[in-house]
From Swiss-Prot:
Name the UniProt record assigns to this protein: 4-hydroxy-2-oxo-heptane-1,7-dioate aldolase
Enzyme Commission designation: 4.1.2.52
A GO BP annotation: 4-hydroxyphenylacetate catabolic process
Cofactor: a divalent metal cation
Record-linked Pfam families: HpcH_HpaI
A GO MF label: 4-hydroxy-2-ketopimelate aldolase activity
């Protein structure tokens, strides 16, 4: 078993991604052919469930883009279900400390290394037990990325980085800026300093730093600092702003929204 995304991070090859929030397999397949290295299927803020994640994994599978799935929480039951339908790389939100990071890793591993329940006869991940020795190979194919999104998590970054089985640490600029008192303004100098310091610290620890940033200049800056998995846009934003701009060019009465969202 292989995990191309995990292998790329280990090799130090920067991976450029796109966030998927439309919760739709048709749009996921459309974007899978766009040329991004990875696509994030969002179960935290988008209206996804296990079934919709499954259909998007199936839609992306024939393409080079690698799927990353974000569950709604660091929940071992939800993680088990997502792994069984075929997710190999998970982005776990709101990890605050090393204990929570260890719990995330344990949820992705079969015993004795972890607590993942065995249900491979029912699982797409094992191709319904058609993959020889799946139970003995699966642990090594898992890629665990944890999100740090608060001042508390930032203060615990060193201990989180020491957790065995953590492949990467993703900095959440929207929640971090809100927690630091600058909601909606991740470009505030204090937030930017925290992000840049974290990227350097994560890379120095031998882990992969990641972030979502639609501002092209900042995204390139993070890559220069050593970020290895960077999402540079969101499908919902691309569709909304693109549609508004097209309508405006043809004299639509509705003014452009002037959206002020983080992404």
């Amino acid at each position: 078993m292989k995990n191309a995304f995990k292998d790329a991070l280990k090799a130090g090859r920067p991976q450029i991604g796109l966030w998927l929030g439309l919760a739709n397999s048709y749009s996921a397949e459309l974007l899978a052919g766009a040329g991004f290295d990875w696509l994030l299927i969002d179960g935290e803020h988008a209206p996804n469930n296990v079934q919709t994640v499954l259909t998007q994994l199936q839609a992306i599978a024939p393409y080079p883009s690698q799927p990353v799935v974000r569950p709604s929480w660091n929940d071992p039951v939800q993680i088990k279900q997502l792994l069984d339908v075929g997710a190999q790389t998970l982005l776990i939100p709101m990890v605050q400390n090393a204990d929570e990071a260890r719990n995330a890793v344990a949820a992705t591993r079969y015993p004795p290394a972890g607590i993942r329940g065995v249900g491979s006869a029912l699982a797409r991940a094992s191709r319904w037990n058609r993959i020889p020795n799946y139970l003995h190979q699966a642990n090594d194919a898992m890629c665990v990325l944890v999100q740090i999104e608060t001042r508390e998590a930032m203060s615990n970054l060193a201990s989180i980085l020491d957790v065995d089985g953590i492949d990467g640490v993703f900095i959440g600029p929207a929640d971090l800026s809100a927690d630091m008192g600058f909601a909606g303004n991740p470009q505030h100098p204090e937030v930017q300093a925290a992000i840049e310091n974290a990227i350097v610290q994560i890379r120095a620890a031998g882990k992969a730093p990641g972030i979502l940033m639609a501002n092209e200049a900042l995204a390139k800056r993070y890559l220069e600092l050593g970020a290895l998995f960077v999402a540079v846009g969101v499908d919902t934003t691309l569709l909304a702003r693109g549609a508004e701009a097209l309508a405006a060019r043809f004299g639509a009465e509705k003014k452009l929204s002037g959206a002020s969202g983080v992404y």
